[in-house]
Design a protein with these regions (language model features):
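N-terminal Rossmann NAD(P)H-binding glycine-rich loop of SDR-like oxidoreductase domains
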Residues: 7-29
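SDR active-site strand-loop-helix element
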Residues: 12, 36, 73-79, 116-122, ...
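Conserved glycine-rich Rossmann-like NAD(P)H-binding loop of the short-chain dehydrogenase/reductase
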Residues: 31-40
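NAD(P)H-binding glycine-rich loop region in Rossmannoid oxidoreductase-like domains
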Residues: 54-96, 110
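Conserved Rossmann-fold NAD(P)-dependent oxidoreductase catalytic core, especially the SDR/UDP-sugar
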Residues: 75, 102-146, 172
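Short alpha-helix in the Rossmann-fold core of NAD(P)-dependent oxidoreductases
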Residues: 93-101, 117, 152-153
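NAD(P)-dependent short-chain dehydrogenase/reductase
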Residues: 128-131, 154, 159-234, 247-249, ...
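C-terminal substrate-binding subdomain of Rossmann-fold SDR/epimerase-dehydratase oxidoreductases
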Residues: 202-315
Length: 315
């Protein structure tokens, strides 16, 4: 039997890309879901087993209120930005993430929740050999462009590992690279895929690509990311991180080629090297999660097709 069936599950960041995917999945698992939103659109789902509440998780009292009667926490509330936003909001990316996360960890442990699921970030890894393993997280400083957010994510990882030793709460942690899918931030602050999809949808030609197009990234479809987190919570809720993804690397130029192929046009590419771009190469070693028995259901193209279909239906 699923560990989620008939359990009271709290999902923070429920209006975001990961949160909405998790809400849908938990309802299918027959859980009783309390979805926490802040100031974005509320969850699009309506269900007898779904309660949507508004809360500011930077306020400890709000965290105390939402944790009541909860068995499992899936914590996705986060302040996230793409390449340009990471340069513009370096302080906010630390403070607006660490305070709500520590608050939720604190109230979860103090209320003896059974499981706590957390998505960490590959920005915590140093710029070392690739593909990078989980054991290498502290083998050097984070990439200079990720210094603030990288150390913040490392801190949260250590807090989780410490809290794992305190009481019965069990922690599941996964580390993806570039998450994409329906309900992403399709705006100025979004990550690469939403911005590229918007350009392709508008028929941009020549097609503007930030940087040289040679940056190497691994992408993971959001439903696969949520599935991996739930899998780790069931199989090894030890607080130790698991890298997750397809294990397939893609350059930004290859990504744009795939997106424009789906839109059935062939624009010329214009590489704007004056625009912000981040680390030139980042690959995760996914051997550990593979050995645990998990693998993703979507390759990049099938995930992009689902994402583009959703965007065209909802823009």
């Amino acid at each position: 039997m699923s560990i989620f069936k008939n359990k009271n599950v709290l999902i923070t960041g429920a209006a975001g890309i990961c949160g909405q995917s998790a809400v849908s999945r938990m309802l299918s698992e027959e859980a009783n879901v309390r979805a926490v939103v802040y100031n974005r659109r509320t969850s699009e789902f309506e269900h007898d087993n779904l309660e949507v509440v508004k809360a500011d998780l930077s306020l400890y009292d709000d965290c105390v209120n939402v944790i009541k009667d909860i068995d499992i926490v899936l914590h996705f509330a986060a302040h996230i930005r793409g390449a340009q936003g990471q340069q513009e909001e370096q302080v906010a990316l630390v403070t607006k993430n660490v305070v709500p996360s520590v608050n939720m960890l604190d109230v979860s442990v103090n209320n003896n929740v059974e499981y706590f699921g957390f998505i960490n970030s590959s920005t915590a890894y140093p710029d070392v050999s690739y593909p990078v393993k989980e054991t290498e997280m502290f083998d050097g400083n984070p990439f200079v462009g990720y210094t603030g957010v990288g150390w913040m994510k490392r801190y949260l990882q250590k807090v989780i590992e410490y809290f794992q030793t305190l009481n019965k709460t069990k922690f599941g942690v996964v580390v993806p690279m570039a998450v994409y899918g329906p309900r992403d931030n399709f705006n100025h602050y979004g990550h690469a895929i939403p911005q590229l999809i918007m350009k392709a949808s508008d028929g941009m030609n020549p097609f503007e690509i930030w940087g040289y197009g040679s940056q190497v990234i691994q992408f993971i479809y959001v439903d696969d990311l949520i599935d991996s987190l739930l899998y780790v919570l069931e199989k090894d809720p030890s607080g130790i991180p698991y890298n997750v993804g397809t294990g397939v690397s893609t350059t930004i130029t290859e990504l744009v080629e795939t997106i424009t192929e789906i839109y059935d046009y062939q624009p010329k590419f214009n590489y704007d090297t004056t625009k912000p771009s981040m680390i030139t190469k980042r690959e995760l070693d996914v051997t550990k999660i593979t050995d645990l028995g998990w693998k993703p259901k979507h390759d990049l193209r099938s995930g992009l097709e689902k994402t583009i279909n959703w965007y065209e239906d909802n823009k």
